[in-house]
A protein has these predicted regions:
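Small-residue-rich hydrophobic transmembrane alpha-helices
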Residues: 48-108, 145-164, 258, 271-335, ...
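Signature of the first transmembrane helix
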Residues: 12-73, 77, 241-261
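Hydrophobic residues within alpha-helical transmembrane segments
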Residues: 19, 23, 54-57, 97-101, ...
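Short runs within selected transmembrane alpha-helices of multi-pass transporters and secretion channels
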Residues: 69, 137-156, 164-172, 193-208, ...
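Transmembrane alpha-helix boundary and packing residues in multipass membrane permease domains
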Residues: 21, 25, 37, 74, ...
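Transmembrane helical elements of multi-pass membrane transporters/channels
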Residues: 16-32, 137, 171, 200-204, ...
Length: 447
């Protein structure tokens, strides 16, 4: 189950880890889209809207859980790299205890707050009942969502990115089958979508537990490993909390930009919504670089191979830049064709083409800043990742989108460029933070 990634070709290690991770992200994106696609076949606009709004709320919660779980991936990776198996076992046990106990509390709090949440997201009156039902079922299933994500984070900390890919594939297939059962055959509407989502993750968790029990690994868990240990919990949370806050803040910024677009009218609002979906697919590559650098970097830091960590960062940036440059150039020529499959309205196509021609450069810069974020997380400096993202959002991304919308009402191109400028600003902060971190490391070595 564990895979040592501290020797051999750096590029080969990156590809070995990142490709399954990329496929996992892709499957997870399909998983999220399945509910909307299937309910649209059997239900009306109100039910589709309910699932759309509810899934956005659940996406934000899931993203924050995944961010917090980054602390587990990094700390376990360091222990594996240092070949400290007792420490790895203690970190795995404490991860399970922390997240599962926390998920039960979170589920109870969310169920209690379901009505205010439905109001906050401005749910249309016709979709309130469906959204409320969808969210209650999903909130009750938060422990299942948490269990899947901590399983994935533990496996990745052990250097195994393939198993989580298989688990999400099982969840995706189960979700589609259950959606057709609950929404198609049983006509349960939004409740059926929520049940399909929750139960499919439960199936995936059960299968992952069976795999863990059957596989032989050098890491052996005992009851004592699940007993909360202050140092282990502190290590996990010190890395995970800044990432969780950062990811939550990013989701809020997307919501703000959506609100800005909504004020421009229906055509621009639709165009921005479509382009956001397209960009989310293209961002799978930069996102996989973040997770790859953090997991591989953590193992090599544990093994004391700091030069190899820098090489991992360089290769990841190179991969991100190459991919970003290819898609950025290509989209300039095929922008309308990229948008057209999502709408038959030619005005929306033209607006979307304008927006994506600017926004696509964010994909180029994101490959760099995401790689730096993974590097900082691997060194336990996730606060630096939170810092550059927060500064980017507050100083460039959101103000830039607002000003672009105000001064360029006839085109969405400047609004798209505002997002790219935000990532470019992040890179500048990352470079400064990187050199500061290297000086800190040299000072420690000299001492």
């Amino acid at each position: 189950m564990e895979k040592n990634l501290t020797s051999g070709s750096v590029l080969k290690s990156i590809l070995f880890f990142s490709l399954p991770y990329l496929l996992s992200y892709f499957l997870q994106t399909l998983y999220g889209m399945a509910d909307l696609f299937i309910i649209g076949q059997f239900e009306g606009v109100a039910s589709t809207t309910a699932v759309s709004i509810g899934s956005q709320v659940m996406h934000m919660i899931t993203v924050m859980i995944v961010g917090l779980a980054m602390g587990a991936t990094v700390t376990i990776g360091r222990a594996v790299g240092a070949e400290n198996k007792p420490r790895a076992a203690r970190l795995i046990g404490n991860t399970v205890t922390l997240f599962m106990a926390g998920s039960v509390v979170l589920a109870a709090v969310l169920v209690g707050l379901v009505d205010p949440i439905v109001r906050i997201v401005s749910t249309p009156e016709q979709a309130v009942a469906g959204t409320r039902t969808y969210l209650i079922i999903c909130f009750i299933g938060v422990p299942c969502i948490t269990a899947y994500n901590i399983m994935a984070s533990i496996f990745r900390g052990l250097g195994d990115s393939r198993s989580p890919m298989y688990f999400i594939a099982v969840a995706c297939a189960s979700n589609i089958a259950l959606d057709y059962l609950f929404m198609g055959a049983l006509h349960l509407g939004p409740a059926g979508a929520a049940l399909g989502t929750t139960l499919s993750l439960l199936v995936s968790v059960i299968i992952s537990l069976v795999v863990i029990l059957r596989r032989k690994s050098g890491i052996h868990l005992s009851g004592a490993d699940f007993k909360p240990e202050r140092s282990a919990l502190g290590e996990i949370l010190s890395i995970g909390i800044p990432v969780m806050m950062q990811d939550g803040f990013i989701q809020v910024s997307f919501m703000i930009i959506t609100i800005i677009a909504n004020h421009r009218g229906l055509t621009d609002a639709a165009a921005v919504g479509i382009v956001e979906k397209i960009i989310s697919f293209l961002f799978l590559v930069p996102s996989s670089m973040l997770s790859t650098v953090s997991a591989l970097g953590a193992q090599n830091i544990g093994a004391g191979k700091h030069d190899r960590v820098d090489a991992i960062l360089r290769y990841a940036i190179g991969i991100g830049l190459t991919f970003g440059l290819i898609v950025a150039v290509a989209v300039q020529f095929i922008a309308p064709s990229v948008v057209r499959p999502f709408t038959s309205d030619e005005a929306v196509v033209l607006a979307g083409a304008s927006y994506i021609r600017g926004y696509i450069f964010d994909c180029l810069f994101a490959g760099v800043q995401f790689s730096f974020s993974g590097y900082f997380c691997a060194y336990g400096k996730s606060g630096l990742s939170f810092l550059h993202n927060t500064l980017s959002i507050l100083l460039v991304r959101v103000p830039g989108a607002y000003l672009a919308s105000k001064f360029f009402p006839q085109t969405l191109l400047p609004m798209g460029l505002a997002s790219a400028c935000g990532s470019l600003f992040s890179i500048l902060v990352c470079v400064i933070a990187y050199h500061w971190l290297k000086r800190q490391q040299k000072a420690v070595l000299h001492d």
